């Protein structure tokens, strides 16, 4: 097989037996003991399968993860069905409408659509149902921005919809910040208790 993050629970129906949730917990525990890190401010970020994994971390390792950033990733429907984090979780997510690996509309009974993921997190976090919106064109690419705000503990769910965007880490500029900067600027506002 190929290397990947196992973003599903280890069960008889999961083709992977890698215990990546346990590995991540052990890694965080080791880093917390050996380095001076703030255990209330641990964030996860990923692309593609890594983004799928950080969504799952927000569900299954929520005792450690304060906020996540996901690029071109989706949640398994099974993950949504079993997702019960210990606290409201701030989410920033980027996805292209022409993504052929993680389709924007999901894959029936396998990957949830971006809309279903947003509905899950906005419902769980009790955010506004009507997002703040904006749109810009960056180098000929239309970017639609949706911010679901006023969630429990100050959480937000932010979605950057890249119209005709592919399965990539987006090289975009939104209000002077690139994708990596947007993620850091967002997640760093949070700790395990919510908005700092």
What are these regions (language model features)?
Residues 1-43, 53-56, 60, 82, ...:
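Serine-hydrolase catalytic machinery in alpha/beta-hydrolase-like enzymes
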Residues 29-36, 58-66, 119-126, 188-192:
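Sec-exported extracytoplasmic/periplasmic mature domains
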Residues 44-46, 71:
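Short beta-strand immediately N-terminal to the catalytic nucleophile in serine-hydrolase-like folds
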Residues 48-51:
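Active-site loop->helix "elbow" adjoining a glycine-rich segment at hydrolase catalytic centers
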Residues 66-153:
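The feature captures the conserved acid-bearing segment of alpha/beta-hydrolase catalytic domains
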Residues 145, 159-161:
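Conserved beta-strand scaffold positions in the cores of enzyme catalytic domains, especially
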Residues 164-168:
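Histidine-bearing beta->alpha loop at or near hydrolase active sites
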Residues 175-196:
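Catalytic active-site module of serine/aspartate enzymes centered on a nucleophile-bearing elbow/loop
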């Amino acid at each position: 097989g190929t290397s990947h993050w196992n973003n599903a629970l280890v069960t008889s129906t999961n083709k992977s037996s890698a215990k990546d949730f346990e590995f991540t917990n052990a890694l965080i525990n080791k880093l917390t003991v050996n380095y001076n890190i703030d255990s209330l401010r641990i964030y996860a970020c990923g692309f593609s399968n890594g983004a799928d994994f950080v969504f799952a971390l927000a569900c299954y390792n929520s005792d450690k993860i304060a906020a996540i950033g996901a690029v071109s990733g989706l949640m398994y429907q099974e993950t949504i069905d079993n997702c019960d984090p210990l606290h409201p979780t701030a989410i920033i997510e980027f996805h292209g409408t022409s993504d052929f690996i993680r389709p924007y509309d999901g894959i029936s009974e396998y990957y949830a659509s971006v809309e279903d993921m947003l509905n899950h997190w906005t419902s769980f976090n009790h955010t506004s149902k009507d997002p703040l919106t904006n749109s810009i064109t960056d180098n000929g690419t239309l970017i639609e921005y949706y911010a679901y705000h006023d969630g429990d503990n100050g959480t937000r769910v932010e979605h950057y919809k890249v119209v005709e965007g592919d399965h990539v880490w987006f090289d975009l500029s939104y209000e002077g910040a690139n994708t990596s900067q947007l993620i850091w600027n967002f997640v760093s506002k949070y700790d395990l208790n919510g908005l700092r």
